[in-house]
Amino acid sequence: MAEAATIAKLEEGFKKLEAATDCKSLLKKYLTKSVFDQLKGKKTSLGATLLDVIQSGVENLDSGVGVYAPDAEAYTLFAPLFDPIIEDYHKGFKQTDKHPNKDFGDVNQFVNVDPDGKFVISTRVRCGRSMEGYPFNPCLTEAQYKEMESKVSSTLSNLEGELKGTYFPLTGMTKDVQQKLIDDHFLFKEGDRFLQAANACRYWPTGRGIYHNDNKTFLVWCNEEDHLRIISMQMGGDLGQVYRRLVSAVNEIEKRVPFSHHDRLGFLTFCPTNLGTTVRASVHIKLPKLAANREKLEEVAGKYSLQVRGTRGEHTEAEGGVYDISNKRRMGLTEYQAVKEMQDGILELIKIEKEMQ
């Protein structure tokens, strides 16, 4: 049972949400009085409460979603809130649906989407993973952060071939190394206000670090927003090469580190928007003609479930007609299907851009 002080804070937060008439978050939409009353006293076995779930969305009324999972159990215990939010965000992943088993499919079905190198600047595929037996950020102790980091760094140091590289802990990082990682766009910063409010940045920078291979085409973030973010990327449009590298890395890491998986929701992550496959496949792409015809761009994006962002990711502008375009769907389909949908959409956008020239 949650403590009285926690429940008092929850009541206060609920009032704040109710009063915020211009708040458009999914939290506000689905945290009805009856759901609130049903959940406000509950506590996971690791001690997480509804407050841990909603505090970021209460503090930041401009959140799009507004909830995070403090641990794996939260997705089950607070399902009356999470399930409708998940269904709404992952369009059509109903509360009775079950995410399919992991399936990377035939990796040779993926191609270079821009062999002439005229449109795609770079290609990236990432996934998130949580380590079994550990809660998510808000519930982690300093000792757990250290323990996880040592497991991750020893696992990664065993990688061979193209994946062979170096692990750089954020703790005690020299200015030179730091600058080099910033120049390569590899370094992650302490979380934004949404993550800060969710208590995702405690004991910073303990337990956080970055691994990259010698070619700088493979990257792992340890204990940023998720326990692990596994990233494969390179300049140009060779999605096939990028995807194959990611798949072999995930398979190698999984042999040594068991991942948190949920029968219904797939791979578990801190933020419910990343659940399921957790896969985000994206390109930085120059589409000057389509940039001038935003309506057409959005129409094609909608047809292939693509998300169009500005050059520097979420909440940014497209600089010089360069967009960050990725698959939007992560749940209710396989990894293969998610990336294939993105490939089909990008090929279509390039075809239309050429026709408009």
UniProtKB/Swiss-Prot annotation:
Disulfide bonds: 201-271
PROSITE patterns tied to this protein: PHOSPHAGEN_KINASE, PHOSPHAGEN_KINASE_C, PHOSPHAGEN_KINASE_N
Domain Phosphagen kinase N-terminal: from-to ranges: 9-91
Binding residue positions for ATP: 122-126, 185, 229, 280-284, 309-314
GO biological process: phosphocreatine biosynthetic process
Entry GO terms, CC: extracellular space
Catalytic activity: L-arginine + ATP = N(omega)-phospho-L-arginine + ADP + H(+)
InterPro entries linked to this entry: ATP-guanido_PTrfase, ATP-guanido_PTrfase_AS, ATP-guanido_PTrfase_cat, ATP-guanido_PTrfase_N, ATP-guanido_PTrfase_N_sf, Gln_synth/guanido_kin_cat_dom
Keyword Kinase belongs to the record: yes
Known EC number: 2.7.3.3
Pfam families, alphabetized: ATP-gua_Ptrans (PF00217), ATP-gua_PtransN (PF02807)
Occurrences of domain Phosphagen kinase C-terminal (ranges): 119-356
UniProt entry keywords in alphabetical sequence: Allergen, ATP-binding, Disulfide bond, Kinase, Nucleotide-binding, Transferase
Annotated SUPFAM superfamilies: Glutamine synthetase/guanido kinase (SSF55931), Guanido kinase N-terminal domain (SSF48034)
Transmembrane parts of this sequence: none
Entry comment describing in which tissues the protein is expressed: Expressed in chela muscle (at protein level). Expressed in muscle.
Binding residues for L-arginine: 64-68, 225, 271, 314
Molecular function GO labels: arginine kinase activity; ATP binding; creatine kinase activity
Family label: Belongs to the ATP:guanido phosphotransferase family.
Role of this protein: Catalyzes the reversible transfer of high energy ATP gamma-phosphate group to L-arginine.
Name under which the protein is recorded: Arginine kinase Cal b 2.0101
Gene source species: Callinectes bellicosus (Warrior swimming crab)
